[in-house]
Design a protein with these regions (language model features):
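Beta-strand-connecting loop/turn residues
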Residues: 52, 69-71, 88-92, 147, ...
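Alpha-helical membrane-targeting segments
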Residues: 101-113
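N-terminal Lys/Arg-rich, disordered targeting/topogenic segments
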Residues: 1-3
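Hydrophobic membrane-insertion alpha-helices, especially the h-region
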Residues: 6-23
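Short, surface-exposed interaction patches in beta-rich subdomains
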Residues: 177-288
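Right-handed parallel beta-helix
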Residues: 130-181, 188
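Edge/loop elements at the starts and ends of beta-strands within beta-rich repeat scaffolds
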Residues: 47-49, 122-127, 144, 163, ...
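Short linear S-[DN]-x-LW-Φ motif typified by the pepsin-like aspartic protease active-site region
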Residues: 26-97, 113-130, 138-150, 158-159, ...
């Protein structure tokens, strides 16, 4: 009886150790809608100089560019993966110490319960001429005006809230693109392995490209010609302002208002100036 109890205790202890390691190695999910806590604990203010262009490269930190009271760049997280910021000739350049594979394993075991975040604040009336961001994790822009953007994430999502861009591109390799309450002019959206989700967005020209994800649009306003091209996901648009549309798919269904067709194409008011074209290979097209 004592022997069984002893073995049972050992199994329980081992289970607790494994659970603890799994917890420490698991990074908390990034929620773009949650309030951003900016306590002074473990915070480094990198610069307070003004700028009109941003060029950021981050190997492991989430990057947040948002409206604030002043020009500020702050970093919260592990100092071994420190973020560096420099302003020269109006250009804010942000870089981060790369994380090697050996350091990454140790970091995940001991420190990954702590979030790594680089937060850039821009005053309300400031308009940026260009934002260039190349990150490995999450990227969030909130209440930002920019003439040109070039945003890319390898393994994280890109979220845009309450912002206006005149031209550019937003690209994810393995993550979603989510845009809400924003205006995009001549902007290309592309996702290799993720969804594109738009809600209350004005789209002036431009396009969306997907390989293996869904395009979800709600309450969109289409100005000029806009196209959505998908390889193996569904394209869905609801409650949107669209004058004309064309839907094509090789091995899926087309649903345009009350019209339905398997494969082939459906179209409506194709000569209208504000027009959207949904192209698909092996997925459905839906406009309600």
């Amino acid at each position: 009886m004592k022997r069984a109890f002893k073995w049972g205790s050992i199994i329980i202890v081992c289970g607790l150790i494994i659970s603890g390691i799994a917890y420490l190695g698991h990074k908390q999910l990034f929620d773009p809608m949650s309030p951003i806590e900016e306590s002074t604990a473990n915070r480094d203010v990198l610069t307070r100089k003004s700028f009109n262009k941003i060029k950021v490269t981050a190997s492991s930190a989430d990057v947040i560019i948002k409206q604030g009271n002043h020009f500020t760049v702050s970093y919260y997280g592990n100092k071994n993966h420190a973020v560096h910021a420099q302003v020269k000739d109006g250009v804010l350049k942000i870089t981060q110490t790369p994380v090697t594979h050996s350091k990454l394993a140790k970091f995940q075991l001991l420190n990954s319960s702590d979030e790594e975040r680089c937060i850039v604040t821009v005053p309300q009336k400031a308009s940026l001429t260009k934002i260039e961001g190349h990150v490995n994790n999450e990227l969030l822009l909130n209440r930002i005006l920019a003439k040109k953007i070039n945003l890319e994430s390898n393994n994280g999502d890109i979220n845009v809230l309450n912002s206006e861009f005149d031209q550019g591109k937003i690209i994810t390799t393995s993550g979603d693109i989510t845009i809400r309450n924003s205006s995009l002019i001549q902007t290309k959206l592309a996702s290799t392995s993720g969804d594109i989700n738009l809600n209350k967005v004005s789209l002036t020209k431009g396009c969306s490209l997907l390989t293996s994800g869904d395009f979800n649009g709600q309450r969109l306003t289409i100005i000029g010609h806009y196209s959505v091209t998908n390889q193996s996901g569904d394209n869905s648009i609801t409650k949107s302002t669209i004058d004309g549309a064309k839907l094509t798919t090789k091995s899926g269904d087309n649903n345009l208002k009350r019209k339905h067709r398997s494969g082939g194409s459906l179209e409506r008011n194709t000569t209208e100036p504000n027009f959207i074209y949904l192209k698909n290979v092996s997925g459905d097209n839906i406009i309600k």
